[in-house]
C-alpha cells in the first residue's frame, strides 16, 4: 500500500491519512480500513459505508444512526457492515432473504472467507452478496468519478467530508474523524 496513516496526531487525534493521489482507490480504502483497526469496533467502516450510500443515492434518505445498529436499507437492498462477521449478522442476513430483501454483507478483505463459511452454515451463501469494504469503497469512488467526470481523489475527499459530518452527528468519539492529505 502506498501512503501512510497516523492515528496519534492530527486535530483532536483524528485518523490522519497521507495518501498519494496517484495510487488506486483500492489502496486508499485499504489504508482507511487499516487505520481504523484497534481504534473502532466497526464504527469507521459503518459510517464510511453510510457516507458512500448518501453520496451515491442523493435522492434517497440514508438514515444516520449509531454504528451499533449495523445496517442500511436502500430500496430492497440491506447493507450489513461487520468488521468481524459473526453468526448473529448472518442470521440477520437470513431474515432479510426470507423477507424478500437482498442482503449485502460488507466485511474487511481478510474476513471474506470467514463470512462465506458462515453464510454456507446459514444456508444463504447463494442469496447473499459478500463484498469487501475495500472493494465497495473503491468501486463507488471509481464509478462516481467516472459518472461525474471528476478525479478519484476529489470524490474520496467528498466522501470523507460526508463521513465526518455523519460521524459527528451520532457518535461521541470524534477522534474517529478522518483527515486525508
Indicate residue ranges for each PLM-predicted region.
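Catalytic core segments in nucleotide and nucleic-acid processing enzymes
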Residues: 32-181
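Interdomain/boundary linker segments immediately adjacent to catalytic/signaling cores
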Residues: 1-40
Amino acid at each position: 500500500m502506498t501512503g501512510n496513516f497516523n492515528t496519534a496526531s492530527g486535530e483532536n487525534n483524528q485518523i490522519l491519512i497521507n495518501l498519494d493521489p496517484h495510487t488506486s482507490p483500492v489502496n486508499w480504502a485499504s489504508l482507511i480500513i487499516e487505520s481504523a483497526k484497534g481504534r473502532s469496533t466497526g464504527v469507521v467502516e459503518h459510517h464510511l459505508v453510510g457516507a458512500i450510500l448518501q453520496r451515491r443515492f442523493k435522492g434517497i434518505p440514508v438514515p444516520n444512526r449509531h454504528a451499533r445498529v449495523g445496517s442500511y436499507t436502500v430500496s430492497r437492498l440491506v447493507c450489513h457492515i461487520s468488521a468481524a462477521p459473526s453468526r448473529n449478522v448472518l442470521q440477520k442476513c437470513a431474515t432479510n432473504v426470507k423477507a424478500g430483501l437482498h442482503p449485502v454483507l460488507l466485511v474487511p478483505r481478510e474476513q471474506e472467507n470467514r463470512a462465506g463459511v458462515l453464510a454456507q452454515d446459514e444456508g444463504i451463501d447463494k442469496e447473499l452478496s459478500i463484498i469487501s469494504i475495500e472493494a465497495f469503497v473503491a468501486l463507488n469512488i471509481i464509478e462516481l468519478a467516472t459518472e461525474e467526470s471528476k478525479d478519484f481523489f476529489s470524490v474520496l475527499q467528498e466522501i470523507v467530508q460526508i463521513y465526518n459530518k455523519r460521524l459527528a452527528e451520532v457518535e461521541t468519539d470524534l477522534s474517529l474523524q478522518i483527515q486525508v492529505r
